[in-house]
Amino acid sequence: MNSSLNLTSNLIFLFFLPLLLWSQPQYTISTNNGAHPGNLFFHVGGQPPRTVNIMDSTGSLIHSEPFGLKGWAWKVNLNNKITYFDRQSKGWFVMDSLENVVDTVYCQNEYIADNHDFLALENGNYILFAYDEQPYATDTISPEGSPDETVTGLVIQELDSDHNVIFEWQSWDHYYMSDYPDINYSSNGIDFLHCNAIDIDEDGHFLISNRNISEITKIHRTTGEIIWRFGGAQSDFTFLNDYPFSQQHCIKSLGNNRYLLFDNGNQSDLYTGGIKRSRGVEYELNLSDYTATKTWDYVHPDSLFTPSIGSIQRLDNGNTLINFGNNQNINRGSVITEVTETNEVVFELEMDNGQNIYCANKAEWNFYSEPVVELNELNQQKKTQLTIYPNPSNSTFFVELKNQNETFRKIEIFNINGDVILSIPFLEQSTINIFPINEKLSTGIYILKATSNEHSYYSRICISD
């Protein structure tokens, strides 16, 4: 709820959420002091039960639910709705704050959506991608190649709200395997373009993270031309004060030519004296001389090396949330760390060994639960004294105070985001205790707050077609 639903301090909000204790993730919180106030969203992979979770700023789980093959990349997306991937149907699910699945999004043109990343935009469009396996005579490139190899490319699609393709990009038009000398041509199947993240830069063009070639690529959103490449064998940029990132995840545009990513660091030992380590890192790119300057990084005090998965998020208070996703090489679960701009740790959570998290994100968002309001114990007993009828309604409905000694002082109606959409004040000397609402409301669920001369009450009103 936003500030428009700023209830008095003695209101009690009871959240009726499916906390299934037997399936909750197992973790330890070692630090929680001054962290960002948003809720933490994460999906636990590995062995069942695979839960989707929301944790509040105190470290308490307020939502934990086993999702089976669903739930991958569980997060609040750009359209202010939860999105997650279903590994069985190969589609992205979009869920509103009432826990209704309001859309399911699949790749078009016979491509199969990949589970790594997905953008649901404010304008209703969707951006997703697919891996595209094609036969390739790699013996024409390398003596270790095969005349009938299978090579994985990439297809990016932008769909409108009706799932029509308005942009499609194919990597085969822009990438050449011969440009990348580190490809292992003796492997059975070559995962050439292993895209694991997509973002939109401040100028509207796409950013993608290609893990296996250690490259961040910027792609023109209408022409499909590659604008620049950062990292890897074909990098347009020279690193000034840092070693190259490798096998990275989670590219994020910060604006002003600054970019944030999770550097898995699979090749970091070549630059750190033989020690592999993962980190969060931020760069500023100079588009005049094509140089890259490291402006921030964070290496965990335990020098965690996360060979796969991981994520990073810059929060609106300047803190950075880092998910060291796969620590099975040292028999540890995922480690989620939040640090300030000066790298002070203000939050750290570690999952039990075997429980891995692909991505972790914070947002000031939660599923809607109808609040039960009590100003005192007597008011709690009297909350049935408010009646709304008919409910559901498709036209005029009535609000009635059952206690004849109570009269209205104010009636307010809120949408599920907590925005006031109707406010009706009454005179102090009003004797009205039944009142018709004639306002035409859109179909949906609303919260009605009735303030009387004695109490405040809340109830749900459903507007039907």
Regions found by a protein language model. Give the residues of each.
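Compositionally biased, intrinsically disordered/low-complexity regions enriched for serine, proline
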Residues: 15, 22, 34, 298, ...
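Intrinsically disordered, low-complexity Ser/Thr/Pro-rich tracts
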Residues: 2-9, 66, 226, 408
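C-terminal outer-membrane/trafficking sorting elements
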Residues: 56-57, 379-389, 393-465
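Generic marker of residues within folded, mature protein domains
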Residues: 13-15, 108, 146, 188, ...
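Histidine-/acidic-rich catalytic cores in large beta-rich domains
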Residues: 24-373
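Bacterial Sec-dependent N-terminal signal peptides
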Residues: 1-25, 375, 465
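Residue-level detector of functionally pivotal "anchor" positions at catalytic/ligand-binding pockets or at interdomain
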Residues: 24-27, 364-389, 402-404
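A generic structural signal for short, non-catalytic loop/turn and secondary-structure boundary residues
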Residues: 16, 35, 291, 381-382
